[in-house]
C-alpha cells in the first residue's frame, strides 16, 4: 500500500528509464511490416475501430512524437486524484491490522475534482470486410469473423455468450481442424465489455490460422457452425460445457482473483455474476442459445470479416 501511495502522490521523472522503454518499443516495432502476425493484428484493430489511433498498433514515427513531459502531466492528471479509483481488498487478512494501513496510505490520497469520462471510440458497424494478401516465409492465412451487438449487461447475457462461444469453438475444432485438417488453430470466444455509453459491447469471434491451400474450403464452416448452433446446438457439447462451468465455478470461488473480478463487476458494472451463476448455467438449453444468437447477437446485422491470404515470399525479398 505504501507503493500505491507513492505512485499516486509522488510521480518522479526518470528520463533514462523512459528513453530505454521507448528504445525497446521502437526495436520491437521496427520490422512490424515484415511480421505477418503484427500486420494482421494491425489490420484487425484498424478494421474494428475504423483506423482510430487510440486502438491501432503504433508506428515508430508515433514514438518519435512522444513528449515525456506531457506523458508525466497526463499521468498526474489520472493518478494523483483518487476520486475515480475503487480499491478492492480480497484475501485472508486481519481486518484490525489492515484498516490502519488503509487509513494511512489509501484514505490519505487526494480525492477531488470530477471523475474522468470514458472517451468514445467508434466501432465499425454493418457488414465490413477487409481481405488482403501478405507474402511471408512460412505462409499461414488468418481469418477472423466477428459478430457484434450492444445489449444490457446481465448475468444471463454473460452466461449465454460464454456458452455460445464454447459451442462454436467445439464445432470449429471438430470441422475446420479435425475434419478438414485445414487449421493450425481454430476457435471462438465471447468478449463482453461495458462501453462508454453504459451498454454492454458484446462480440462473438471465430478465428483460425489456416493452411493457405484450404482457406476457401474452410471459410464456409465459420457460418455453417454458427447456423447449426442457432438451429440445433450439439446436445452433448452443451451438456459437457455446463458440467465444466459448474465444476469450475466451485474451484474459482476459492481464489482471490475470482472474488476480485466478482466485486469489480458488482461495484463498477452493477452486475452480480456470482449469486445465481450455477443456477443460470443449469437452466440454459438449446432454445435459449438459439434465441440469444438470433435475437441478440445477429439481429443488429454487425459482422466484421478480416482475412489475410498468405503467399510464399520470393527468395531474396
For every predicted segment, state its role:
Residues 1-9, 21-30, 35-64, 82-90, ...:
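M16 family metallopeptidases and their MPP-like homologs
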Residues 70, 285-292:
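A short, acidic, amphipathic alpha-helical segment used as a generic capping/interface helix at domain edges
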Residues 95-99, 195-197, 214, 314-316:
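Extracytoplasmic/secreted cell-surface and envelope-processing proteins
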Residues 114-171, 175:
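His/Glu-based metal-binding/catalytic segments typifying zinc-dependent metallopeptidases
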Amino acid at each position: 500500500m505504501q507503493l500505491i501511495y507513492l505512485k499516486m502522490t509522488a510521480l518522479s521523472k526518470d528520463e533514462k528509464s523512459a528513453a530505454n522503454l521507448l528504445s525497446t518499443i521502437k526495436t520491437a516495432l521496427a520490422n512490424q511490416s515484415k511480421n505477418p502476425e503484427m500486420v494482421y493484428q494491425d489490420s484487425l484493430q484498424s478494421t474494428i475501430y475504423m483506423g482510430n489511433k487510440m486502438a491501432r498498433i503504433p508506428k515508430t514515427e508515433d514514438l518519435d512524437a512522444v513528449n515525456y513531459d506531457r506523458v508525466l502531466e497526463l499521468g498526474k492528471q489520472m493518478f494523483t486524484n483518487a476520486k475515480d479509483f475503487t480499491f478492492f481488498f480480497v484475501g485472508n487478512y486481519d481486518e484490525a491490522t489492515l484498516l490502519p494501513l488503509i487509513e494511512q496510505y489509501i484514505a490519505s490520497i487526494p480525492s477531488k475534482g470530477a471523475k474522468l469520462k470514458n472517451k468514445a471510440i467508434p466501432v465499425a458497424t454493418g457488414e465490413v470486410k477487409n481481405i488482403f494478401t501478405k507474402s511471408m516465409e512460412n505462409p499461414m492465412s488468418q481469418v477472423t469473423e466477428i459478430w457484434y451487438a450492444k445489449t444490457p449487461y446481465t448475468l444471463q447475457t454473460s452466461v449465454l455468450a460464454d456458452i455460445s462461444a464454447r459451442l462454436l469453438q467445439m464445432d470449429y475444432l471438430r470441422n475446420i481442424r479435425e475434419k478438414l485438417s485445414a487449421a493450425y488453430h481454430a476457435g471462438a470466444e465471447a468478449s463482453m465489455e461495458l462501453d462508454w455509453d453504459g451498454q454492454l459491447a458484446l462480440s462473438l469471434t471465430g478465428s483460425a490460422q489456416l493452411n493457405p491451400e484450404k482457406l476457401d474450403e474452410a471459410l464456409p464452416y465459420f457460418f455453417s457452425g454458427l447456423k447449426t448452433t442457432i438451429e440445433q446446438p450439439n446436445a452433448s457439447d452443451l451438456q459437457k460445457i455446463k458440467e465444466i462451468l459448474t465444476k469450475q465455478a466451485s474451484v474459482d470461488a476459492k481464489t482471490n482473483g475470482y472474488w476480485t473480478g466478482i466485486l469489480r463487476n458488482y461495484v463498477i458494472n452493477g452486475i452480480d455474476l456470482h449469486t445465481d451463476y450455477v443456477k443460470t448455467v443449469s437452466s440454459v438449453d438449446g432454445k435459449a442459445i438459439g434465441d440469444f444468437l438470433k435475437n441478440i447477437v445477429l439481429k443488429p446485422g454487425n459482422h466484421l470479416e478480416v482475412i489475410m491470404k498468405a503467399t510464399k515470399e520470393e527468395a531474396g525479398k
